[in-house]
Amino acid sequence: MVRDIVDDPLDEDDIALVKTYGLVPYSAPIKKVEKEIKELTEKINDLCGIKESDTGLAPLSKQMMQEGQPLQVGYVSCFRYIPIDLLMDIFSRVPAKSIARFRCVSKLWESILCRPDFKELFMTMSSIRPPLLLFTFQDDDGNLFFFSSPHPQIPCNENTSLVPTRYHVQHTTDSFSEIGSPLCGFICRRGKRNLDTMVICNPVTGESVSLPKVELKSINTETRPYLGYDPVRKQLKVLCIKSDDIPNTCDEHQVLTLENGNHLWRTIQCKPHYPKSDGICIDGILYYTAGFDMRARVSMVVCFDVRSEKFSFINIHVFMLMNDSCTLINYKGKLGALQFTCLSPKRLRFWVLVNAEKNIWTKCIYALPPLWNNLVQHTELAIVGMTDGGEVVLSQYCLIYAFYIYYFNLESKSLTRVQIQDVEMFKRTRVYTSLGYVENFKLM
């Protein structure tokens, strides 16, 4: 059973936690914590059949609200008879920002929310919730600013906007980084100058870990990291693909398992190829497009089995006209690909791999709606992916004046523009937009 939560002033370590999670100045965050705890208490009461009069819920005093006073939380006793496993189940259903605040309520709550089994449970619950949009802004110094938001309810009106949740800032030493697609709540980035150095970061916790440097054969050797997940063994791995200006020279690549802080690269063999796209992991298989070398066209989809660490290949015929701008997607559990046509009028090509062994793809071409020119105008857009509802998500490469994302429904041919608010400070900044982000409190 869990002991009572009583008035428990925070010591210096707790106040450091508060500052870490952005709860300064104290007055406004305390009100937010009080509101969030009250909402959490009501959920617990409903689950346990406890009346409000039985909880002994005491509000924070005005004295506590005065700025500069030590942060104290005076909630008592509604958790008296609730087992820890039930508390963890309840905590796992609230947003990550609330968890960050709840860790500062008392040492008891902090101990619960820091448990490895709670972090595993939170990750499981995040995975079954609707995935989030993740926005990563990169300033001129290379610093990364992370925001997330749920998708809007589609269809929505033309004035729809989203206010994203802001996470921690990642400070980098490289003025420009290549940002990979998120997986299991983590992101892998690689510096433009330091091609042998990769960093794994968690936007929610602000934690980042530099991986051991990979071995480069020459100064012309390039690297591209990918994240892959094995759902059977529940292992997250980093695959580092190497390529060179000289064709057919790099047949050794490296893979690393992210677990227990023991990060060691292992060498694996694969025929030389040059990656052309971001990767996507579907049921333990990591996919990305590639050519035979840097200057060659897209001629294959590389398939990497994350568990066995074996490669296979799907040939891309010339007549498919798949190019470097192609975006791979998860279409109802199958590999799909989206790409704009190069010729005017612009259209959208959509492929789905229906039989990998026989290399059979279906293909559709969609004309863009007349509203396209009015809403998009001269904005250069990237294909981000596809939602579970079948809408293609498009995003700006760079924030110029306002930041918009677009939803193109393939069935209705409708186009919806959604403004992302509170990011105006990142004007003329590179932005990476990703689908399928899940919040995660795990450490590496």
Swiss-Prot record:
Name the SMART domains for this protein. Answer: FBOX (SM00256)
Query: Which domain of life does the UniProt lineage start with?
Result: Eukaryota
Q: Which residues form the F-box domain?
A: 76-125
Per the UniProt record, one Pfam family is FBA_3
Q: Which InterPro entries match?
A: F-box-assoc_dom_typ3, F-box-assoc_interact_dom, F-box-like_dom_sf, F-box_dom
Please give the name of this protein: F-box protein At1g53790
Report the source organism.
Arabidopsis thaliana (Mouse-ear cress)
